[in-house]
Amino acid sequence: NSSAPVSSPSRCGLTTGKFPIEVGINTFLNNKASNKKCEQRNFLSDKNPSMARAFQSAGYATGHIGKWHMGGGRDVHNAPSIKNYGFDEYISTYESPDPEPAITATNWIWSAKDSVKRWRRTEYFVNKSIDFVKRHKDQPFFLNLWPDDMHTPWVPEFKQKDNKSWNTEEAFIPVLAEMDKQIGRFIKALDELGLSENTIVIFTSDNGPAPSFQSARAAYLRGTKNSLYEGGIRMTLLIKYP
């Protein structure tokens, strides 16, 4: 089970090992006014424990590539650097203290003006992840690869101009297929680099699916994202190990 049924607090729980309420994050991080209304902090304090920092202290190279959403973005400009949480290097999205310019051409989660288009974002993250692994293959490493393409809007390449369909099952399926392809490419790279027999890969999610498709995406469990029923907090968990 995840520690919360929505993104930001769940990610904080995974990062720190604490209950989200302990770190002052109880729903998705938004602008300052919304955060205040929800009685939560504007960002995860870097004074909290961090899984990456523990690995870093043990001599691991550490990297974060993908969505952050634990502080930064919108009108929150004082969130700590991702490096403060124990990451040697990072690439992140709009909802972070230092978003990657290639995927944040405007002041929003994504834009048609981004040089890396929405439908190429996971490919971009995997390219950067493979590069990270290649550079650190001769030492222990810890990598967060947190793609965000399964979060709405789902923008497959063939539907890029049809914004009326970005929340439909028709759009969801090819986006899911593309993510599956890219994760497979990353696993293959580990094989080709001779790292599969010395690397643990954990595949999971931050929360249940958005309420859609007659709840079928939650495997017919009661509840979905934003719900404390099983459909909101019971996650896929796959672990590949030597």
Segments (PLM) and residue ranges:
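Formylglycine-dependent sulfatase
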Residues: 1-242
